Amino acid sequence: MEIKRTASAGTMESSDIMITVKPSNNGIKIELKSDVEKQFGNQVKKIIKNTIEGMGVKNVYIRAQDRGALDYAIKARTRTALERASKGAEEIEK
């Protein structure tokens, strides 16, 4: 999957995560800001990275703003943002 544009998914509400995806040429880069980063930061990054790799993405910049989201929400938000970012403008308008 190729990331063609910037896209996001999620909210800044409690127990959710906002994932912003941007094209990159430098592999996978994840920037995380989290209310629970000391406790769960590595786990959140691992879920995001596994989701990215599972979708076949090789180059992407991800900014994640976590407000205590559970694993399933992190994965769903990441998948949605990646899918949105992989579509060109002509595909979105359909």
From Swiss-Prot:
Entry superkingdom: Bacteria
This protein's GO CC annotations: cytoplasm
Keywords: Cytoplasm, Phosphoprotein
Residues bearing PTM O-(phosphoribosyl dephospho-coenzyme A)serine: 14
Major subcellular site: cytoplasm
Keyword Phosphoprotein (UniProt): yes
Localisation: Cytoplasm
Function according to Swiss-Prot or TrEMBL: Covalent carrier of the coenzyme of citrate lyase.
Family, per entry: Belongs to the CitD family.
HAMAP family attached to this UniProt entry: CitD
UniProt subunit comment: Oligomer with a subunit composition of (alpha,beta,gamma)6.
Name this polypeptide is given: Citrate lyase acyl carrier protein
Species whose genome carries this gene: Halothermothrix orenii (strain H 168 / OCM 544 / DSM 9562)
Gene assigned in the entry: citD
